[in-house]
Amino acid sequence: MAYPLEKALDVMVSTFHKYSGKEGDKFKLNKSELKELLTRELPSFLGKRTDETAFQKLMSNLDCNKDNEVDFQEYCVFLSCIAMMCNEFFEGFPDKQPRKK
């Protein structure tokens, strides 16, 4: 039986590999692969309209080694940043249900 966090990690890894390597290095996401991943897997993050300038800036910020691709480590940093933003957002809300022990 997989635990929720194990399932989350599996989804994180398998989602990266679902999109990486379609057009090149199988261990990296190029610009179009990253855009497809975000559009299909994180549609709320991009919103209804994709601003090309904003996407270019995101790609540039994620691509720490400036190879014009996002590797798994860069992808993990991105997901970690999103998780931290979500956590900060929800810290301001009172609990509606008691926490499970």
From Swiss-Prot:
Entry's localization field: Secreted; Nucleus; Cytoplasm
One Pfam family from the record: S_100
EF-hand domain mapped to chain residues: 13-48, 50-85
Origin: domain of life: Eukaryota
Gene Ontology terms describing biological process: positive regulation of canonical NF-kappaB signal transduction
InterPro entries found in the cross-reference section: EF-hand-dom_pair, EF_Hand_1_Ca_BS, EF_hand_dom, S-100_dom, S100/CaBP7/8-like_CS, S100_Ca-bd_sub
CDD domains: S-100
Residues bound to Ca(2+) 2: 63, 65, 67, 69, 74
N-acetylalanine found at: 2
Any GO CC annotation of this UniProt entry: nucleus
Chain positions found as N6-acetyllysine: 7, 35
PROSITE patterns for this protein: EF_HAND_1, EF_HAND_2, S100_CABP
Residues the entry annotates as binding Ca(2+) 1: 28, 33
Listed GO MF terms: calcium ion binding; calcium-dependent protein binding; RAGE receptor binding; transition metal ion binding
Keywords: Acetylation, Calcium, Cytoplasm, Metal-binding, Nucleus, Repeat, Secreted
Record's function text: Calcium-binding protein that plays a role in various cellular processes including motility, angiogenesis, cell differentiation, apoptosis, and autophagy. Increases cell motility and invasiveness by interacting with non-muscle myosin heavy chain (NMMHC) IIA/MYH9. Mechanistically, promotes filament depolymerization and increases the amount of soluble myosin-IIA, resulting in the formation of stable protrusions facilitating chemotaxis. Also modulates the pro-apoptotic function of TP53 by binding to its C-terminal transactivation domain within the nucleus and reducing its protein levels.
Subunit structure: Homodimer. Interacts with PPFIBP1 in a calcium-dependent mode. Interacts with PGLYRP1; this complex acts as a chemoattractant that promotes lymphocyte movement. Interacts with MYH9; this interaction increases cell motility. Interacts with Annexin 2/ANXA2. Interacts with TP53; this interaction promotes TP53 degradation. Interacts with CCR5 and CXCR3. Interacts with FCGR3A; this interaction inhibits PKC-dependent phosphorylation of FCGR3A.
Annotated protein name in UniProt: Protein S100-A4
Organism whose genome encodes this protein: Bos taurus
Gene that encodes it: S100A4
